[in-house]
Amino acid sequence: MTLVQVKDKEFYLDDFLKQRLDNLKDIVYKKNWDGVFIIDGLERVGKSTLGLSCAYYLSDGNFTVKNVCADGDDAIRKIESFPDKSVLLIDEGSLIFNSRDAMKKEQKKLIKILNVVGQKNMIFIIVLPSFFDLAKSIALRRSKFLLHCYTDNSLVRGRFAYFGEDAKKILYGVGKKNYDSYEYPKRSLNELGRFTDFNPLGEEYFETKRQSLHSALHEDERIKKTDLALRMILHVDKYVFPIPFNKKMRREMLGIDERTYTKYLELATTGGVLATTLS
């Protein structure tokens, strides 16, 4: 490992990882590309710590709690306001509390976010529990590499495995068929690294994570309430009436104008209400 100094802080970086991060800095800052990569691992293995270390190094120390995105909506706001070639980190650990529908909705936001990241030549770090939960377009096509965090047999934190672009493709295909296994393709000794407990943001970062988790815990509840409200407004059970009711008849019966009705239909397709509600 190499002792690096960034501004007034010193911390250790794995030699192989430092090379990969230096390559990423060159791609973004000198060649005007974007740099997206993924860090995953089970809960409490240290993936957020590794993410902060990478972000702080890549930004040359210009990384604060404002560069951390609590969720997709927060990321959209920050990407629009931050200058080109900024470093942002989104910690999606909260996804473990979300339903499958909520996760799909969040990933649709991520895809849109990554399009803007590319236009603004940003570095964007995605931290989440499992690489296999990501859509293929994010996991394979829009990310440079994966750092998978894990512990040793004694549950000691601070280890990661590196998967480059080609290795990610094999991992995604084979691993998904084997209960999300990370065993294949095998990693060389260089691609198995260590990291230290370095958190440049201190308690501020943990407060941001708590807010993200709180939002995720209440997300399903909010969706259920919205779903119920829209069902009451729009859903007409066809078996109650002797004839089927089309969309125009529903609008007229409920006294809802076409614009409002269209808005609710849009919610149905974007996750605000179940798609079956208005079928």
Could you describe each region identified by the protein language model?
Residues S137-R157:
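A short helix-turn-beta junction within AAA+ P-loop NTPase domains corresponding to the substrate/partner-engaging
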Residues V68-I126:
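Conserved nucleotide-sensing/catalytic segment adjacent to the nucleotide-binding pocket
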Residues D152-K224:
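Phosphate-binding and hydrolysis-coupling loops of NTP-dependent motor/remodeling domains
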Residues V36-S59:
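Glycine-rich phosphate-binding P-loop
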Residues Y56-V68:
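Post-Walker A helix-loop "phosphate-sensing" segment adjacent to the P-loop in P-loop NTPases
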Residues E221-P244, L265, T270-G272:
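Short, amphipathic alpha-helical "recognition" segments used to contact nucleic acids or chromatin
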Residues D257-T260:
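Short coil turns linking two alpha-helices in DNA-binding domains
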Residues M1-V28:
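N-terminal pre-Walker A segment at the start of P-loop NTPase domains
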